């Protein structure tokens, strides 16, 4: 049984608070574990959430501000200490190479060879390493070079068992129909794959952190089943958001609406806001976005919504 869920480790922005740790987000995707933006204290939050170093197969860093990267030394040294043997690929902006080097070798420790650095440069980068899904990085609009990430699995064709049975198509004929897109039946009639199958779009996860409003944020989030996006400020602080190239809750909702997102997770909240203002984040995002909205809390788990489907009928082997 596959498991696809987001485990939120930290939800504050530049300064952690008593209730909110620095950033940290762990995406469990079947046998893969992708750690996004490990801020200060990520190791400790992993312990609370039941995540081990062995669970991490990839790390994605959006940019090298401290709240998104100060946890890297501890995570890397924990990977080394715990004897992780599988490759752990780390994607990050190539423009921050000097900061990567400092964090990678921040203190003395018995090093590991499993860390594979993947510096990113360019307007659109397909990050290599996984066969089951594609990792795409696009630049965002922040004060230093920053990338957002999109995890997408390919669409799949599933055969409709009830329609196949009604037409008398079975056995090897089903395989030929799926492979070739059509077949000629015993009566000489052409049978089209589209009439006996349904396209199941692959699931999509998007991670948009530290940016002003920009086209690439929408592109990253396009038709995402789950979007994790910063909402540093409430709408009243729109001027501050623009000055520091961050998003308001309303802008996060607008991006989600434009992209056709299914489930929206708001996070990366300024320390100026307390518990009594949390409902305002949801309300301001909901003014633009009609889908499901989750206000992230530390050590929260959020499921990736089940796959979308197009067409109808019983799916064979689903």
From Swiss-Prot:
GO terms for molecular function: 3'-tRNA processing endoribonuclease activity; zinc ion binding. Zn(2+) 2 binds at residues 67-68, 210, 268. Zn(2+) 1 binds at residues 63, 65, 142, 210. Its EC number is 3.1.26.11. It catalyses: Endonucleolytic cleavage of RNA, removing extra 3' nucleotides from tRNA precursor, generating 3' termini of tRNAs. A 3'-hydroxy group is left at the tRNA terminus and a 5'-phosphoryl group is left at the trailer molecule. The active site is at 67 (proton acceptor). It is an enzyme of class 3 (hydrolase). Its cofactor is Zn(2+). Pfam families: Lactamase_B, Lactamase_B_2. InterPro entries: Metallo-B-lactamas, RibonucZ/Hydroxyglut_hydro, RNase_Z/BN. Binds 2 Zn(2+) ions. The keyword Nuclease applies. It comes from the Bacteria. The keyword Metal-binding applies. Keywords: Endonuclease, Hydrolase, Metal-binding, Nuclease, tRNA processing, Zinc. Homodimer. Zinc phosphodiesterase, which displays some tRNA 3'-processing endonuclease activity. Probably involved in tRNA maturation, by removing a 3'-trailer from precursor tRNA. Belongs to the RNase Z family. This is Ribonuclease Z.
